[in-house]
């Protein structure tokens, strides 16, 4: 992950405040290992509670949907995870990408199957609303498309997730972006709400068509 400190400006999206909070949260350095370890322990405990309370679900609505991105690649949704929770007060979309190390051919199918076991590593993070799991694209990159309640919470998760992904990913292939003020379903229904010019014109994270 590149250690970026600048915030990438976006066009104002529907429902977004017209101030600095409308800027995308771009990549920051990963969190320290000790912070990540504590966060993962809390997350695993919260995930177990959600499962016990039957508040975590695997909706089938979007499974099989194909997303085409501005960089010319496309990927299929192979799983969705959703959390029963209260109203989302500060919605945002988080998009993460990575490329697995030394995985080829049938290895991708095996990863998609076993990735269900990774649920305790993300399901209990504060603010999670939903996650769509996207299969590998033409360049071998996986993506996660999340809705989160709170951009800062989403960013904290992404910076913790980096440490986990780094264990199995090609160096330099892990990236994320947080898009404040946007709901995932809005993005799925109207991908044109995102700007099509400037840095976003050919961005790996910007959906341009849904089928």
Indicate residue ranges for each PLM-predicted region:
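Short S/T/G/P-rich N-terminal loop/turn motif that feeds into the first structured element of a domain
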Residues: 2-125, 180-211
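Amphipathic alpha-helical interaction segments
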Residues: 122-125, 155, 168
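Conserved short beta-strand edge segments in small beta-sheet-based binding/regulatory domains
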Residues: 166-180
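Short, non-transmembrane amphipathic alpha-helical segments
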Residues: 161-165
């Amino acid at each position: 992950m590149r250690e970026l400190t600048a915030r990438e400006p976006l066009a104002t999206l529907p429902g977004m405040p017209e101030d600095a909070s409308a800027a995308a949260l771009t990549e920051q350095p990963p969190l320290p290992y000790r912070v990540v370890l504590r966060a993962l322990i809390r997350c695993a405990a919260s995930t177990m509670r959600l499962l016990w309370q039957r508040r975590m679900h695997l909706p089938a609505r979007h499974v099989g949907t194909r997303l085409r991105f501005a960089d010319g690649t496309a990927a299929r949704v192979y799983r969705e995870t959703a959390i029963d929770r209260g109203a989302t007060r500060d919605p945002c979309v988080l998009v993460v990408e990575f490329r697995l190390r030394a995985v080829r051919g049938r290895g991708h199918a095996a990863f998609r199957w076993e990735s269900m076991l990774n649920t305790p590593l993300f399901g209990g993070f504060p603010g999670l609303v939903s996650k769509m799991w996207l299969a590998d694209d033409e360049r071998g990159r996986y993506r996660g498309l999340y809705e989160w309640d709170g951009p800062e919470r989403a960013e904290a998760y992404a910076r913790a997730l980096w440490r986990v992904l780094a264990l199995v990913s090609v160096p330099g292939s892990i990236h994320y972006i947080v898009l404040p003020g946007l709901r995932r379903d809005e993005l799925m229904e109207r991908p044109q709400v995102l700007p099509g010019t400037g840095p976003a014109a050919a961005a790996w994270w910007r959906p341009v068509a849904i089928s």
